[in-house]
Amino acid sequence: MRAELAVYFIAGTQDIVRGTLPGVLEEALKAGITCFQYREKGVGSLQTASERKEMALECQQLCAKYQVPFIINDDVALALEIGADGIHVGQNDEGIRQVIASCAGKMKIGLSVHSVSEAAEAERLGAVDYIGVGPIFPTISKADAEPVSGTAILEEIRRAGIKLPIVGIGGINEKNSAEVLTAGADGVSVISAITRSDDCYSVIKQLKNPGSPS
């Protein structure tokens, strides 16, 4: 799982400023993302279940083509219906115990955490495959984001002996990703660093190899 978290792209139709979500996703897959989470939320997102399912299936097919895990944000019913590779939920989404009861053994389970105690609880549950920690930096992609934690939270979680795979979340781009990895994350998740880039190949190359020339 750790290797799959290296460059973890998150997006929904609301994040796309040029082209289409499938078009941007395929470019990112060609460029080397290691995981994709379909997150359809907020202003400008698809509103009907049928639209979301149709888009999810199109994205899932692209991920399968490039052998990259396809994860759905929050929508357990949709993830189970289409056989997603994983489900990711936040502290305020569907209760994690309910998600575990529905999904354990069928797909990977990811959980967002914002503190050492939440990370410890995720590990104690035994069925969470990885945790998303953040927001590390200020983010424009999530209107209801928690307060910014900085990279210190990653160091604190690792010092506490928590061994779950970690992906850093929130305001991460090719210029600051090295800090996130150095602090203890196994990978970085990005939205706008890819969706708002004119050259996602360069961005993803730098995310995979921090410090490499663009």
From Swiss-Prot:
It catalyses: 2-[(2R,5Z)-2-carboxy-4-methylthiazol-5(2H)-ylidene]ethyl phosphate + 4-amino-2-methyl-5-(diphosphooxymethyl)pyrimidine + 2 H(+) = thiamine phosphate + CO2 + diphosphate; 2-(2-carboxy-4-methylthiazol-5-yl)ethyl phosphate + 4-amino-2-methyl-5-(diphosphooxymethyl)pyrimidine + 2 H(+) = thiamine phosphate + CO2 + diphosphate; 4-methyl-5-(2-phosphooxyethyl)-thiazole + 4-amino-2-methyl-5-(diphosphooxymethyl)pyrimidine + H(+) = thiamine phosphate + diphosphate. Gene3D superfamilies: Aldolase class I (3.20.20.70). This is Thiamine-phosphate synthase. Its EC number is 2.5.1.3. One of its GO terms (cellular component) is cytoplasm. Binds 1 Mg(2+) ion per subunit. GO terms for molecular function: magnesium ion binding; thiamine-phosphate diphosphorylase activity. GO terms for biological process: thiamine biosynthetic process; thiamine diphosphate biosynthetic process. Keywords: Magnesium, Metal-binding, Thiamine biosynthesis, Transferase. Belongs to the thiamine-phosphate synthase family. Mg(2+) binds at residues 74, 93. Pathway: Cofactor biosynthesis; thiamine diphosphate biosynthesis; thiamine phosphate from 4-amino-2-methyl-5-diphosphomethylpyrimidine and 4-methyl-5-(2-phosphoethyl)-thiazole: step 1/1. 4-amino-2-methyl-5-(diphosphooxymethyl)pyrimidine binds at residues 37-41, 73, 112, 142.
